[in-house]
């Protein structure tokens, strides 16, 4: 049972489950799911699964975050509706809602520009292992700086539209493989003085529109290109695996950040990037 994910690579059922786990376990941690979905299969000799497969199984992560934050989303939506009726957007849920809406615009524009002007982005040098490793180290250092400088004082009740815009521009950087959408938005939130778990919580909510749209677009492209039933089944299994482990990762990270700082992720990202660069330099790993 195989699924075509690019012109050269195919995944079997077990590989789809493993990559679903990798996607789910890393999507909401500030370590880049895209980087791990590129590195893990290459290290295991499976090849690069490609942008399309990565984007589609992210839909499992979206179902997880919608389920986990259903009360938050209801609160925000009701607040937005009430704000529209009253023409007063100063309330907490209205500010959160506007932050999510306007914070989504930068990554949508960036994604459209890439799709329009870089049709072969799947094979871009930015997706090479060396580029991903360097980006991982740089983003790890930025997270460390944010952790050190942040006041960690502001919670969701103090969230404003400006925070959503700032984190939205940071989210757009995640179009570069290895940046980490969760990592870039968490870093931006910390620079804004948000508490760690507050920055993470809003980061998850902010990511819902962008990840959903990206996943649906890639799924549509796959269906239009022609994909058989067995391949859809394997893709579904990978997405289900992503859903389960995404939910677990969200729950764990929010608990972790209430009582811990982000230095463990900083160290991990630097080591992750360093190991990849060393492996490439020594010829242990091919820079694909």
Curated annotation (Swiss-Prot):
This enzyme's EC code(s): 3.6.1.27
Alphabetical list of Pfam families matching this protein: BacA
UniProt topology in membrane: Multi-pass membrane protein
Keywords recorded for this protein, A-Z: Antibiotic resistance, Cell inner membrane, Cell membrane, Cell shape, Cell wall biogenesis/degradation, Hydrolase, Membrane, Peptidoglycan synthesis, Transmembrane, Transmembrane helix
InterPro entries to which the protein is assigned, alphabetical: UppP (IPR003824)
Segments crossing the lipid bilayer: 11-31, 49-69, 94-114, 129-149, 159-179, 199-219, 234-254, 265-285
GO BP term, pick one: regulation of cell shape
NCBIfam families according to UniProt: PRK00281.2-5 (NF001394), undec_PP_bacA (TIGR00753)
Entry function: Catalyzes the dephosphorylation of undecaprenyl diphosphate (UPP). Confers resistance to bacitracin.
Family matches, as PANTHER family: UNDECAPRENYL-DIPHOSPHATASE (PTHR30622:SF4)
Entry protein name: Undecaprenyl-diphosphatase
Species of provenance: Synechococcus elongatus (strain ATCC 33912 / PCC 7942 / FACHB-805)
């Amino acid at each position: 049972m195989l699924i075509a994910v690019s012109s050269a690579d195919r995944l079997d059922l077990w590989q789809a489950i493993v990559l679903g786990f990798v996607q789910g376990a890393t999507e909401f941690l500030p370590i880049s799911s895209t980087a791990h979905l590129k590195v893990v299969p290459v290290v295991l000799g499976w090849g690069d699964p490609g942008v399309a497969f990565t984007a589609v199984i992210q839909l499992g992560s979206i179902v997880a975050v919608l389920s986990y934050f259903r009360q938050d989303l209801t609160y925000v939506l009701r607040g937005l509706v009430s704000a529209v009726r009253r023409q007063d957007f100063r309330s907490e849920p209205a500010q959160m809602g506007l932050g999510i809406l306007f914070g989504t615009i930068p990554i949508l524009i960036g994604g459209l520009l890439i799709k329009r002007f870089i049709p072969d982005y799947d094979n871009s040098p930015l997706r090479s292992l060396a580029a991903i490793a360097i980006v991982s180290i740089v983003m790890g250092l930025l997270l460390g700086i944010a952790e050190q400088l942040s006041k960690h004082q502001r919670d969701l009740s103090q969230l404003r539209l400006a925070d959503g815009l700032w984190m939205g521009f940071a989210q757009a950087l995640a179009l570069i493989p290895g940046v980490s959408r969760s990592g870039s938005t968490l870093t931006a939130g910390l620079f804004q003085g948000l508490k760690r778990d507050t920055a993470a919580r809003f980061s998850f909510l902010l990511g819902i529109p962008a990840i959903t749209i990206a996943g649906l677009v890639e799924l549509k492209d796959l269906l239009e290109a022609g994909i058989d039933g067995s391949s859809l089944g394997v893709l579904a299994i990978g997405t289900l695996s992503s859903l389960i482990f995404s939910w677990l990762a969200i729950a764990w990270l929010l608990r972790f950040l209430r009582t811990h700082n982000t230095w463990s992720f900083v160290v991990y990202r630097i080591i992750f990037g360093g190991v990849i660069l060393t492996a490439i330099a020594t010829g242990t790993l091919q820079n694909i």
